[in-house]
Amino acid sequence: MAPDIDNIWSSTTDAAESPVDERRILLKRAVGQKILVPSILSLMPAWPSQVHPAVDEVNTEIDKWLPTVNVAEKKKAKHRARGNYAFLTAVYYPYCKETERLVVIAKFLYWIFFWDDEIDTGGELTEDEEGTIQCCEETNKCVDDCLGPNPNYNPPPNSRGTVEMFYPILRDFRAGLGPVSTERLRLELHDYINGVAKQQKVRQGERLPDPWYHFKIRSDDVGVIPSITQNEYAMKFELPEYVRRHEAMEEIVQECTKLTVLLNDVLSLQKEFRDSQLENLVLLFMNRYNLSLQAAVDKVLDLIREHYAICVAAEKRLPWSEDDEKLNDDIREYVRGCQRLATGTAYWSYSCERYFKQTQVNDKWEVLLDLSYVE
């Protein structure tokens, strides 16, 4: 279980080595190692993975749309080659009612990766705190313009490309969501946008963060939570607010979010290490507890098992109706949507080359991660 984080910094701020030494020592301990990671999907056995049959059609529509987006061609090409977010959309929403809605969600996923890349390690705003604040303010304004009480779908003049492209995407979401879901999505997007800025401050800190603190802020503000609400858009239903705020549903959302963070940090470990992005839970556990790479990976895998079990148990406490089967169907679909955020992220990670090469994955879906530097 996670410890109390009230005093988490006490063990790191008194460390003898300098912040530079701390990072250098961690890099030296991990570099050159290889580790075989078991199938992440096997750790969530009751949650199957499917792919929407219209994935190729969505890809075709994305190919038509991308040239119209005001984002650097190099960035578009990189994400198109390595990401395949149309496929990610198809595993997140395998039963989406309309292909047109699936295309809108795919555009949203392209937006979130484009936008996050501006601020994440290696982006234009990675070291620019003032620029990041301005970017977040402009993006938050877009969210309120499109999803607030007085909708305005016209981006301000000279908007940055990632803000400009977001206006029509949110317009389409609003057209297909009920008022309760629209407001939920608005608030969740604000949490995500503000959370990215908060994570940037952590990365800019002199010392590596405590893993439990890092896990908490990422789980609180991670971008998958809006994608859960978008399942209501995909499946054409609106979950009543009392069901969404029921303690069991809150726990399922939180636990699936935590699962997504945990499994993503395992599967992205090789890429992030090679990018010298050390704010990864595996590496942070190595640093905090002086663990070997194997022990740190095992710790994260154990956390996946733990949070999966909590999530499965919570389903029994949901507010099932005795006489409204439509409501029960909507609850089941909402829960499946939460689960697919975890399984879909894993399935997609194995199926594209954003984090590692296909040649590193065997027929058991085990992946051999390689923490060597590659020019």
Curated annotation (Swiss-Prot):
Catalytic activity: (2E,6E)-farnesyl diphosphate + H2O = trichobrasilenol + diphosphate
Recorded GO MF terms: metal ion binding; terpene synthase activity
Residue ranges annotated as motif D(D/E)XX(D/E) motif: 116-120
Pathway: Secondary metabolite biosynthesis
EC number: 4.2.3.-
Cofactor binding note from Swiss-Prot or TrEMBL: Binds 3 Mg(2+) ions per monomer.
A family per Pfam: Terpene_syn_C_2
Keywords: Lyase, Magnesium, Metal-binding
Chain positions recorded as Mg(2+) 1 binding sites: 116
Binding, Mg(2+) 2: 116
InterPro entries hit by this protein: Isoprenoid_synthase_dom_sf, Terpene_cyclase-like_2
Motif (WxxxxxRY motif): 348-355
Recorded superkingdom: Eukaryota
Residues given in the record as (2E,6E)-farnesyl diphosphate binding sites: 354-355
GO biological process terms on file: isoprenoid biosynthetic process
Residues that bind Mg(2+) 3: 264, 268
Cofactor: Mg(2+)
Motif NSE motif mapped to chain: 264-272
Similarity remark: Belongs to the terpene synthase family.
Role noted for this protein: Terpene cyclase; part of the gene cluster that mediates the biosynthesis of the brasilane terpene glycosides brasilane D and E. The biosynthesis starts with the activity of the terpene cyclase braA that converts farnesyl pyrophosphate into the sesquiterpene alcohol trichobrasilenol. Subsequently, trichobrasilenol is glycosylated by the O-glycosyltransferase braB putatively using UDP-GlcNAc as sugar donor to yield brasilane A. The latter then undergoes two rounds of oxidation performed by the cytochrome P450 monooxygenase braC.
Quaternary structure (record): Homodimer.
Domain notes: The 2 conserved active-site motifs D(D/E)XX(D/E) and NSE are required for coordinating the divalent metal ions that stabilize the PPi moiety of the substrate. The C-terminal WxxxxxRY motif is frequently found in terpene synthases and is important to guide product formation.
Protein name, entry field: Terpene cyclase braA
Species assigned in the record: Annulohypoxylon truncatum
